[in-house]
């Protein structure tokens, strides 16, 4: 290997990134990356795209919460924590490898894996430094719980009426009967799988992650964020249902490419991304209001008053 590297031109060798040394910190980070990768691979193979992307966002949030501590990270576990962490992590890796689609354990395994990694890094009394990352990963089982707590029937009816409302604003004639949006040439029925409960739960969980990673100090701002999070998720999905109703009314019903795009996971993923993007803009605007002005701005304001 060394002889092979010696034949590489110096100009090309300079562009090859150096391999980090095998320090305890780097080995722990490598192990963390391997655990996250295996978990996301399990989500990708057993869950739909929406949940897989959400899991990736959760892991990203956990990493952001840990980012400020990376420079001072120095793994030094005690023997009880080392044994417990190794046992837990071995079980998590083995359990993740046999996950099936209906297995709810997949939502809990990331949290258990993070606890194991914390035990492999710090003494038991010191794992509090990973609190925010653990709370981020707690959003995965919380997401599953929220999806089950939100009632399907009333939400489907509300989704249908709001979809009809959007169509009415745009000038399209429609009638809403219970869960069905009817138009002159067809209509759609809002079933539990399409009522947007996943988008609502997702945006709520993203709100919690944002609050952990970039906390808002103002109580009013926090109230606004957590009040609008489910509204943004619901509104995004009702627009998607309205588009589906338009597709059916224009002869692009079930089986057509246009209907399949907006009905199946790809179109749902697009609107899920839109809801997270809109929420992110709202959150960052509120966060900017709490940040102190830049020194240059302060200087300009002082000069103006003079």
Where are these regions (language model features)?
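Hydrophobic N-terminal alpha-helices or hydrophobic patches in metabolic proteins across all domains
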Residues: 1-306
